[in-house]
Amino acid sequence: MNNTADITVLGAGSYGTALAISLASNGHKTLIWGHEPEHIENLKRDRSNEAFLPGIPLPDLLIPEADLATALAASNNVLVVVPSHVFGLVLKQAKPLLRKDARIVWATKGLEPETGRLLQEVAREILGDEYPLAVLSGPTFAKELAAGLPTAISVAGTDEAFTNDLVELLHSPKRLRVYANDDFIGLQLGGAVKNVIAISAGMSDGIGFGANARTALITRGLVELSRLGEAIGAQPSTFMGMAGLGDLVLTCTDNQSRNRRFGLALGQGKDVDTAQAEIGQVVEGYRNTKEVYTLAKRLGVEMPITEQVYKVLYQGGTPHEAAKALLAREKKSETTDSE
């Protein structure tokens, strides 16, 4: 079947729209689908995503499409950009409509709810082994990407040809640098763990602890990410790149991050529900915390920062209690395996 579009994006939120804008601005005909027909009609009418990226026009090559079957028939390249808790649901909806030559890439950052499984496991369980899979990850704020500000990300997958094609599709000398990576596992994990650490950094700043504490959390958060990555077969070098250190620093230090702002509100004494309501969009780190905590417990990996964030979000703990618990931990060598 011939393509009538170069790529189809599933997910018309802020990040899905930003990636679609970048692709279309790079000269690629791009279809974007969302689960709410009214939202897609608004995109068609306004030629912008006023709900998530107000004031940023959609390029002519970006076509909103409300019908999932039409969107999936248009291209064999499918980019999934939905929250992690609906990732499996969207794949189940898409499966009977996928072309036989479909290739699936996602920019979803997270793990499977309740189980903490990597999204590649979810995808394989739903789709089987016939489709090439890939993941995009790295330090990206949707608003900056959509506005054409310089950005860099990484891509890894199960099929080298697909990975290389994605680099060609996404890379733009003017706006987006794309690095190929061979660590499919590591790129998936980094995008989930960094959200948890960003919440902790936000809580620390909300309490008023300052730059020293924030930097310590980022540094030890990277240790936790690396430790968990090693336990599931990721490459340590991945976490010094875009999907590890890069995404971690961005999300922990800039208030464009919903996860950081969520943590700030918690540190200032607001409860979980109020803090989430103030953000007004999905706070991925809320669910990511439970996912990462579940995975770490299953693998027997020590992750003290993650554990304390989990206690605040799910067990009624407070940010002050979390800080006390971390500071009161037994003295250890920085270079030993346990924290």
UniProtKB/Swiss-Prot annotation:
Pathway(s) per entry: Membrane lipid metabolism; glycerophospholipid metabolism
Residues annotated for sn-glycerol 3-phosphate binding in this entry: K109, G138, T140, K194, D247, S257, R258, N259
Catalytic reaction list: sn-glycerol 3-phosphate + NAD(+) = dihydroxyacetone phosphate + NADH + H(+); sn-glycerol 3-phosphate + NADP(+) = dihydroxyacetone phosphate + NADPH + H(+)
Main location: cytoplasm
Subcellular location(s) of the protein: Cytoplasm
Residues the record lists as binding NADPH: S14, Y15, H35, K109, A142, R258, V282, E284
Alphabetized InterPro entries for the sequence: 6-PGluconate_DH-like_C_sf (IPR008927), 6PGD_dom2 (IPR013328), G3P_DH_NAD-dep (IPR006168), G3P_DH_NAD-dep_C (IPR006109), G3P_DH_NAD-dep_N (IPR011128), NAD(P)-bd_dom_sf (IPR036291)
Highest taxon of source: Bacteria
GO BP annotations, alphabetical order: carbohydrate metabolic process; glycerol-3-phosphate biosynthetic process; glycerol-3-phosphate catabolic process; glycerophospholipid biosynthetic process
Active-site residue list: K194
EC supergroup of this enzyme: oxidoreductase
GO molecular function, one term: NAD binding
Alphabetic keyword roster: Cytoplasm, Lipid biosynthesis, Lipid metabolism, NAD, NADP, Nucleotide-binding, Oxidoreductase, Phospholipid biosynthesis, Phospholipid metabolism
E.C. number: 1.1.1.94
GO cellular component, one term: cytosol
Function: Catalyzes the reduction of the glycolytic intermediate dihydroxyacetone phosphate (DHAP) to sn-glycerol 3-phosphate (G3P), the key precursor for phospholipid synthesis.
Family designation: Belongs to the NAD-dependent glycerol-3-phosphate dehydrogenase family.
Name this polypeptide is given: Glycerol-3-phosphate dehydrogenase [NAD(P)+]
Organism: Shewanella loihica (strain ATCC BAA-1088 / PV-4)
The organism's taxonomic lineage, starting at the top: Bacteria, Pseudomonadati, Pseudomonadota, Gammaproteobacteria, Alteromonadales
Encoding gene, per UniProt annotation: gpsA
